[in-house]
Amino acid sequence: VEEAAAAVELRKSDRERISADVESVSAYAFDLQSEIPLRAWLFEVDADDSVLVAVVHHIAGDGWSLGPLARDLAVAYAARCEGVAPGWEPLPVQYADYTLWQRELLGDEDDSESVGASQVEFWRRELADIPDELPLPFDRSRPVVASYAGDVVELAFDVRVHRGVLGLARERGASVFMVMQAAVAALLSRLGAGEDIPIGSPVAGRLDEALDDLVGFFVNTLVLRTDVSGDPSFAELVERVRETDLRAFGAQDVPFERLVEVLNPVRSMGRHPLFQVALAFQNAPVSDLVMPGLEVEAGPGGTGAAKFDLSFNLAESFTGSGEPAGISGGIEFATDVFDRSTIERMAGWLTRLLEQVLADPQRPVSRARILEDTELDQVLKGWNDTHRATPGAVLPVLFEAQVARTPDAVAVVCDGVELSYREVNERANRLARLLIGQGAGPERFVAVAMPRSAELVIVLLAVLKSGAAYVPIDPDYPADRIAYILDDADPMAVITVGNSGVELPAGTSRILLDEPGTVARLAATGAENLTDAERLGSLGGDVPAYVIFTSGSTGRPKGVV
């Protein structure tokens, strides 16, 4: 068997540059055709401090693997200090043994009695009609192709919250993970993600203790679907999560990649299939690194990448006596769609939501307050401060001011007809004078029964210029509805055209715009702007402008002025 050695590169650094150096090498991209999937860098920060960065490709190791890898490193260092070869304990199994065992466990999917077939069928049912994409509160639209650039915001829950989570978990026969999953799902639902919240979660996949000390990729990803419908209490939501998760854990052997092949969801280069939010609870054993002559401390590493839109990565801490000491971690987010400030606020919202629901688990999740006082004030007052100073001028005057500014600009386009502001204004002035001559003015109504057209805009403006209020009537209304509206509103006249098809009651006073006599009178009328001296009363913002009648679905139509 040909042995391969991992590349180890020695570099100089200093305290100002070390964080950037670590981040840079952590994002190393392996060429798996020519490189082994493990690489290391040793940075000399100063005479007394060095930083070792080991990067393992996921094909060769998972998060759990870092423990045995660190222990093997400590054994090797101690041996080399003594000038001897490392005396590693032989492993009971190799990764190849695991792959053969898994293949044997799943069996043939074509065999309906096999474990693989039954688990695939479970996931077909469990994930039926799952949302293709979770509508999260993005800061910008998702790109067509994801860049996978990411960042992390720290997340920490104090001892009080940790105790509350543990207590509720024990009370409901659930795990800490399940309580946190319910909290994340409740938050996302409150932020507009809907009532069906799929969350991806890794499982260690080491179902035999013989695998505990083996470096390799055993992790599988489960899609945990959280039902937040019906406004449940948080306690009820935890119970729902518990039932869903226990079912899913019983079918955790089918690889996620195989599920994607079988379920064949709508694919996109811009997002992850089946879920876009992940929740990981780190419970791998932590190894204390002991190396002769060295003080060793494990530090955080980051790749600057994000596989999902959001990934909540958490871990519990305990005191030496086993007492809860807090839950900490971070929210990894895709910078394609989120700003850091949004995720910082989200971390605060999750903390406040947990504090609220732990204090009263029977409280519906919809009633848990998640906003800070300043945020609540912004929502209730700042964004609702819609007061604006309005001009004292009425619509006809405002329109005439626009005519003065852009007389030849296009004002109306309809069915191939284009009219400028000047044309609309002059024709409306003529019709307004005709209406005033027939008694139109403030506190009077003029009904308009015309199809949608450029002419309709002129008519409505003319009624307003006269000082009267218009009553719109759809020519397609039933005759009895039209009769009722006219009887209730009592307009001085109905403006219409000959081909409108409207059925008006006998004796209704009407103005037919396309009647030759009307056309002649309009042509002989002045087109300049009207003055209050010509009107029966002054225009003002306190006189009626129009009357809209309700549908009448619950009785008779009612006019709203």
Regions found by a protein language model. Give the residues of each.
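Adenylate-forming
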Residues: E23-D31, I36-V45, V55-I59, A74-A79, ...
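Carrier-protein-dependent adenylate-forming modules in NRPS/ANL systems
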Residues: V1-L91, F138, R163, G167, ...
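C-terminal membrane module of polytopic membrane proteins
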Residues: V115-G116
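Internal, well-ordered interaction modules that form the hydrophobic cores of assembly/scaffold domains
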Residues: D377-L380, G441
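Short, highly charged C-terminal tails/helix-capping segments
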Residues: S366-Q378
